[in-house]
Amino acid sequence: MSETIKILTIQDISCYGQCSITVALPMISAFGIETAVLPSAILSTHTSGFSGYTVRDLTEDLPAIRKHWEKEGIYFDAIYTGFIGSIEQFEYIKDIIDSRLKPNGKVFVDPAMADNGEFYNGFDQDFADKMGELCNLGDYVLPNTTEACYLLHKPWKEEFTKEEMLEMANELSAFTKKYVILKGDTHKEGKLGMIILDKDEPSNAEFVYNDRINKMSHGTGDVFASSFVGATLVGKAPSSAAKLAGELTKKALEETIDDPTHNYGVKFERVIPSRSEDTSELQSR
């Protein structure tokens, strides 16, 4: 029997709303990966579509958690960061990566801080610059075009050409140890795509496309990132993992699109079985 892969995901918990840890934990676990969590904050709901939500920042808890893990000899094969609660947490998270990641372990950074040309509530360019420092530790960095523009200090626009996407991915390679997965390529009609660039082989960059669903929904980035992380860790190549993650995200949107009352995420739970079938051969190796 092969040894179980162990991953730590660091991001917030929204008690209600399908995003962040409440997506990452079941999605990655379904790949047969043991998934530990480190909440950066606890919110009563996610921040989109709700008002008056409560937030408990957990920055002060991070050092004690890391110290306890050190005492217990707890290490991880991979670490995946998502929504980070405050700018003060970056140094603690970098320390956790440095001290709790096994040799040759992999780091996935989803710089979840912006979309549609705007920062999420509470974030600014200083936060983006700190996020760039965290991206430097990542073997895989997964920004959308808005996040990429903030990382690069470039103006954002709704549409980028294929050539502009490639140029931006090459510029982003300075922020990663290995791979850039740049999401949000819309130049192909009826398709939503991404570019996968290996900084060691930039001339072999790949574009991957899935059918486009014309619905904006909270949490789709988390479904994509979690699926990509899981598929990569069980052996899929980055382009294959990105294709699978994009397909699962599309299916989750399709499950949600006809329910106008479901405005707090996508029904990702309904696509987990089909994703498990897609990866069953890899899980049994």
Describe each PLM feature range:
Residues 2-109, 113-121, 269-278:
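Conserved N-terminal subdomain of the carbohydrate kinase-like
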Residues 14, 41-43, 85, 113-115, ...:
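Glycine-rich beta-alpha junction loops
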Residues 150, 215-238, 242:
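Short, small-residue alpha-helix embedded
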Residues 121-205:
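Conserved phosphate/ATP/ADP-binding segment of small-molecule kinases
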